Amino acid sequence: MSDFLKSIIKSSGNEYAGIASEGIDGSDVTGFIDTGSYAFNALLSGSLYGGIPNNKIMALAGESATGKTYFALGMCKKFLDDNPDGVILYFDTEQAITSDMVRERGMDPSRVAIFPVATVETFRHQAISIVDKYIETKDSKPVFVVLDSLGMLSTEKEMNDTAEGKSTRDMTRAQVIKATFRVLTLKLGKAGIP
């Protein structure tokens, strides 16, 4: 049966397809990133020593100024502590992260790359380019990606409308965000990047 399924998978041309008994590449959880909080670890993974899956996208949601950025930085610190050769790719939409903040939280700033982004399209292009390169690279180092914050990302249409003095609402924003994460979710999972 296995050879039959393998031939079907091969003929599909789907690089992400696989047989469930052999593990589903990008879907099966292979480990966890400790959040630094036993209670939050238990909520997310069912174990005090778990945390966020190391190959899944996770969103921190909450009102403005409730500490989401600081919590994300705490997870970055824990990730770097647990992965001595790991790096952080931090997409910052608010120009909020500084090298001092990184240092003050005990992280080596030479292991944290900050990517200022203003639009969903810019984030999508840069993130997909990085993930594609990561997948191609043999012996890649562990990577943790943070987008802070999704809510602050504009679209190119919104930026253009604002520049032209239009006050119309961009009705395409939700679709652009959804399309971005449809592509990124599969690619990040395949690459094993949280």
Q: What are these regions, as identified by a protein language model?
A:
Residues S149:
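Walker B catalytic acidic pair
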Residues D85-V87, D139-F144, K190-P194:
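Loop/turn-to-beta-strand initiation segments
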Residues A127-V145, L184-L186:
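Short amphipathic alpha-helices and their capping/turn segments at secondary-structure boundaries
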